[in-house]
Amino acid sequence: MKLPSDIELFELVDKLSLTYFNKHFIDKVYFNTRLRTTGGRYLPSKRVIELNPKYVLESNKEEFYGIIKHELCHYHLHIEGKGYKHGDRDFKELLKATGSPRHCSPLPSQQREYRYKYQCIQCGFVYKRVRKVNMRKYRCGKCRGSLKEI
């Protein structure tokens, strides 16, 4: 999926808002390239939705639409004066009613590559590590068994 323009993005958000919330989206939405660990955010003081452009480029359409629906839940509840934060009951109920995700999946480009894998000899638990582990010094945290490199 290619990155839509600001006008196309606004039209997409308004269309999803009408489809799932039966209300128009009348405020601003734009891409924020500085977002790194989140799919999007709603700024209540400015009534602005910011979206991470990496999710358009690296994930599928359903994942990106889910992020927009999640942020629209924050938006519409804030406009109505209801609880719009993650822990509020109104927010959780609206997420469930619209089929919006609670969290977005991690970006493929942000996932770690583990160079070393160790397995406990006794319980079989697998540890993934970026750095090498001294197997004589460290043991399994679950059963205290010794480790072997896979």
UniProtKB/Swiss-Prot annotation:
Keywords: Cytoplasm, Metal-binding, Zinc. The keyword Cytoplasm applies. Belongs to the SprT family. SMART domains: SprT (SM00731). Residues 11-149 form the SprT-like domain. Zn(2+) binds at H70, H74. It is found in: Cytoplasm. GO terms for biological process: response to stress. Binds 1 zinc ion. NCBIfam families: PRK04351.1. Its cofactor is Zn(2+). Pfam families: SprT-like. This is Protein SprT-like.
